[in-house]
Amino acid sequence: MLNLKVIYFGTPQFAATVLEDLLHHDVNVIGVVTRVDKPQKRSSQPIPSPVKTLALSKNIPLLQPEKASDPQFIEQLKAFEADVFIVVAYGAILRQVVLNIPKYGCYNLHAGLLPAYRGAAPIQRCIMDGVTQSGNTVIRMDAGMDTGDIAGVSYVPVGPDMTAGELAEALSAQGGEILIKTLQQISDGTISHTPQDSSKASIAPKLSKEEGFVLWNHPAEKVYAQIRGVTPAPGAWTLYSYQDKPAKRLVIRKASLASNKGIYGNPGDVIVSDQQELLIACAEGAICLKEIQPEGKGAMDSKTFLNGHSNHKLKLSFQNN
């Protein structure tokens, strides 16, 4: 077990997966900080974060400040006399007064290859950009947004059909290992830090729901990258109309590139293959919709959707932006 006393900051499942790995390897986590409970989706009841649930199950002291700058919270942190703070997808900015508390500083696990994709959505943005390699970067935090010196990097390939959710799982599964290595280097005095090359920096801001609206007037490869990048959240969607009725929202849960590249049609046109596949024409090529969710209904495969729309070849059309 490492002798370092660690306080862990994190909130979503990504952070819970990493924390569980640290605990499995006997990292001395003496306290956990997570965001306050918030209602999720249709539930009006506050729901604890995955990190909170894990911390409580392990009987680890837990803090949930409304603001990380709260003076009482800062005094509580100081009372732990921690050696290191580890921050993984906490979800709030930590000011310098907090970063100065631990003996050896604060280290952040960033789910991207810094200095590229600084910000809240490195996983989604890199897939939307069509990159083939991502990874985790550990930085010693400073007051900037993901601008700290690099202490470690690990790499994860991005498969051609990988969604943001799948990449997040791969990165979180690897995150504990690189953090344990970092903590060991801090403990034995071999840690080194490399300044980021800011000339190579890019920003990855949080995605809006509107960015899930599929733009069919791009080549199919770019459309597919967009769909994968916003899956599962904020989610890919389009609008469709049927028999001159008002347009409705259609959520795209699973899709693929159409295997037949010789597909022609205006962007947004519906094409039904001989195998009863639901294809949507793009500027070049087409997207095959595998699993969808029409507005007001549950998720279904494309064949079920087509069976409910007679004369679909003539009267079903997807709106294009």
Swiss-Prot record:
GO terms for cellular component: cytosol. It catalyses: L-methionyl-tRNA(fMet) + (6R)-10-formyltetrahydrofolate = N-formyl-L-methionyl-tRNA(fMet) + (6S)-5,6,7,8-tetrahydrofolate + H(+). Its EC number is 2.1.2.9. PROSITE patterns: GART. Keywords: Protein biosynthesis, Transferase. Attaches a formyl group to the free amino group of methionyl-tRNA(fMet). The formyl group appears to play a dual role in the initiator identity of N-formylmethionyl-tRNA by promoting its recognition by IF2 and preventing the misappropriation of this tRNA by the elongation apparatus. NCBIfam families: fmt. This is Methionyl-tRNA formyltransferase.
